[in-house]
Amino acid sequence: MMKKILTNYFFIRFLRALVTIFVVATFTFFLIRLMPGNPLDIFIATQLSQGVPLQEAQERAASLFHIDLSKPLLVQYVDYLKNLARGDFGVSIISTNTPVSKIILRFLPWTLFVVTVSLFISFVGGVLLGVLMAIYRNSWLDQILSFFASIISAIPNYVIAMLIVVYFGVKLKWFNIAEIRGSLSPGVRPEFSLYFLKDAFYHAMLPIIVYVLTTIGSWMLVMKSSTISTLGEDYVEVAKARGIKQANIMINYVGRNAILPLFVSLAISIGFVVGGSPLIESIFVYQGIGLKLSDAIVTRDYPVMQAIFLIITASVVFANFLADILLGVLDPRIRTSRS
């Protein structure tokens, strides 16, 4: 009976996730087309600003663009849904004859690489420091770490990125700004080799540092609060009365239960940052999906914008869905309440 109830619950949640994605995709489709300007006008305006005569600019636009913007909006929407149902994101307006899926596959892995590494470092570091703050709460160590976590969490990531570039790059010259641009050095190809990994980490180093600094504070504070709350539970007191070693209590009784609420936040964080930060990737000129989204917005490349927004939406929605399932599996109290 309980298994059936949980199955129905997760099935309903899955349907809600699909409906949410559909609604957001529809909203995004129409919102993008309500933006001032269209790809054709922006391309011609850019050509004119570069001194190209109007007639020549129009001829270039006619040879490059293969999209009928004169179609009724509803017809374009129906065509979009038909293509989406087949898994076809369409063809980029700006990158002539280039499938959007090919563009996504080219840029998305670099963002996923940065996101995975940075969230792993910040989550593990934040959890460990949060537990340490809870154990030594009200001490000078707790006060210093709490102050650091509060300050660093309040600073926007793009501000930290600009400070790193201006102060450490331009003023102190700790790194060459021009050399670190992009996701790989010229001539380096993706392959399973130490040289490739070193080069990839070198170019991703600054975005990773920014993401770690702007997320670790939240993990520290949430884990500290959750650990303090868990330390006051009856089962922890019973474990102490039974003479169980302090290390075992902290790992098996406190740590395991205190970390559960953080899994929801972790899943949501993964979903949100899959799209990358357009500002961060633009500041460091890191060739991820966020930088590509910025370029697509500027040029009004509708198919690319739609695909990236859809990926971000799906990531956030299904991250929430998976977090809900994960909590149900790991926490017996949630399974009991849902049944």
Go through each PLM region and give its residues:
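Membrane-water interface segments at the C-terminal ends of transmembrane alpha-helices
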Residues: 27-34, 79-82, 148-179, 210-212
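Hydrophobic alpha-helical transmembrane segments of membrane transport/permease proteins
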Residues: 21-75, 172-195
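Short, motif-level signal for alpha-helix interfacial/capping segments enriched in acidic residues
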Residues: 14-18, 32, 133-135, 302
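An internal, D/E-rich "acidic patch" concept
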Residues: 2-6, 68-127
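Hydrophobic alpha-helical transmembrane segments of multi-pass integral membrane proteins
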Residues: 22-27, 73, 77, 116-120, ...
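Flexible, glycine-biased helix-capping/connector loops in cytosolic signal-transduction modules
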Residues: 38, 85-87, 276, 332
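Hydrophobic secretory-pathway targeting helix
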Residues: 2-29
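Alpha-helical transmembrane segments of integral membrane proteins
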Residues: 4-7, 108-141, 157, 170, ...
